[in-house]
Amino acid sequence: MSLVQSLSALLFPQLNVCHLCGRALEHARLLCPDCERRARGCHLPPSQQAGYDLQQLGGTVSAFYYRGVPKQLVHLLKYQADTALAQWLGEHMAAVLARSSLANADAVIPVPLHAQRLQDRGYNQSLLLAQVLCSCTGLELISDALVRSRPTGTQVGRTRAERLQALRGAFAVSDPHRLSGKRILLVDDVLTTGATAIACAEALWWTGTISVSLVTACRAEKDA
């Protein structure tokens, strides 16, 4: 929860407030109309979805560019424990997935956190997004299929090559037989360089999966 939202909730406990700007809302919703409108301005159009192809993946789709309101929402979800925002982001991920060729996946797998990071944060934001996505689409969620076998530290500020090196061998599959012959859809919050998804895909390929694709809430712009 943001500072503005916390103050609004403290001063006006009977009101619903926008999770981003703290504006009082008449109805139970997560964002005010103005913040919703600004967020929609960052939607990733269908014509741009194919602009971030990764050879190791069957495809990628993202709901938003990683800027403006969507970027703020991801930060609130990830670092300020505003877990309610997973609902809003996950619904938009489900909508963009439904319009893509990746909607025929057999199973959804969230990108895992290392046990220590999970303990520190208290939740895995990718799992929260995956739960909403599966609720909207009816796809099967396999939440424990992947494990992060060693800590990799923050990837912020690292180059793509550095990320690939840091993440190589960082993921393992808990039960390979459960995934054999399935089309897997990975779920993560942000697609930046693709290093995390590639590392996950490399672990999953050994299980005999048919394909591994990725859906995220946001995608970094290549010139960002």
Language-model region placement:
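Glycine-rich phosphate/pyrophosphate-handling loop used in enzymes and phosphotransfer proteins
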Residues: 1-188, 192-224
